[in-house]
Amino acid sequence: MASPQSTKTGLNLPAGMNQTSLRLETFSSSFRGISSLSSPSKSTCSDRFIPCRSSSRLHAFDLQDKEPTTPVKEGGNEAYSRLLKSELFGSDFASPLLSPAGGQGSASSPMSPCTNMLRFKTDRSNSSPSSPFSPSILGNDNGHSSDSSPPPKPPRKVPKTPHKVLDAPSLQDDFYLNVVDWSSQNVLAVGLGTCVYLWTASNSKVTKLCDLGPNDSVCSVQWTREGSYISIGTSHGQVQVWDGTQCKRVRTMGGHQTRTGVLAWNSRILSSGSRDRNILQHDIRVQSDFVSKLVGHKSEVCGLKWSHDDRELASGGNDNQLLVWNNHSQQPILKLTEHTAAVKAITWSPHQSSLLASGGGTADRCIRFWNTTNGNQLNSIDTGSQVCNLAWSKNVNEIVSTHGYSQNQIMLWKYPSMSKVATLTGHSMRVLYLATSPDGQTIVTGAGDETLRFWNVFPSVKMQTPVKDTGLWSLGRTQIR
């Protein structure tokens, strides 16, 4: 049986819907049909299925702070955002955040600066942390990176204790003597009282070279550069030359009135300094005892060193003077009087010509550096102790100094900064004697405590590997066919 609604309209209408609502829907549909003639409209049908997730527990993963932010927290978030963008995209991308409010900055877009991230050529002169490939600004204190400078090397470790200690009885505690020297053939010569002993470093063999007798004593020893002959200065003013291999005396030369406390060889001339204030030049190829006399010091000569090119001779004396001589004159070309105590410690730089270092005694305590070309003092360092000896490393640009009162220490310096590399202690008395091994790595020090101590202070020479030729001439062919 049909319902009353269906009989009137002839349609089966659902419950709750009358003919009036149907008429309104029909009118609305006809109106939409008219409006579609003017402009097309998108279909109201959707091709996506959007599920309802009201029952899911996504709120459990919402870890953001729902509390209202404070100005301090907002400032921290802004600083963090600026730093993050600077780390990811460079400082230029974060710089608009620093611009005043209302500025024309483009901080919202990290790619706002127009820069080429990949280029065929890098302009090293304009490289800065703004480049996406530059190091992090967090690793630089000043905010500027330097692509060309390598990272700083860790400080070199120097052993604080000697690797060998030898007893040296009768080793004299006299500041003005020089009785220890190490030859280029790895033989150490030591003057002990009236005798000279040779210690071979390769096998620790000890050989007695000579005995001057009860009325004489050894005041200085010096090997030739080749290491075959050794000169000995005596308390009677003589200079003896011995064959170190055969242990035979070759020659004896006089000329000094009193003890000969210092000797220095160049390629062919032997220079000797004495308490009589004179410097004698000996040539063993001629018959006379000496070929020239250099007069300039007013007190005992206690330091002598030839430059590596044999052009200049530096002499130090108890008159606090440092004199520089050349081969063409018997008058000093330089008189350096800045020291206030005796100048015994003298060394020439093997790395730079005309660079001379000298050390003063107890009243001076300074190491001074000189340019012998113009006589200018380059630097002066107060060591705090009497400077007894100086030696420049031939392997690296470093210098070692031995000291007396008041600390009796051995100090290693880096030139030209003169920063301390190491300070070595062990001698109970002032360290009066110093010599360097032929490989330039080890030094031996002697003191009035009658001990010789061997220290490893300098690194070895870096051997440069030869560059292999990979060109056309390196194909291994010895002839053209």
Curated annotation (Swiss-Prot):
Activator protein that regulates the ubiquitin ligase activity and substrate specificity of the anaphase promoting complex/cyclosome (APC/C). One of its GO terms (molecular function) is anaphase-promoting complex binding. WD repeats lie at residues 172-209, 213-252, 255-292, 296-335, 338-380, 382-423, 426-465. FZR2 controls the induction of early rounds of endoreduplication while the remaining rounds may be mediated by FZR1 and FZR3. This is Protein FIZZY-RELATED 3. It comes from Arabidopsis thaliana (Mouse-ear cress). PANTHER family: CELL DIVISION CYCLE 20 CDC20 FIZZY -RELATED, PROTEIN FIZZY-RELATED 3. Residues 125-136 have a biased composition (Low complexity). Belongs to the WD repeat CDC20/Fizzy family.
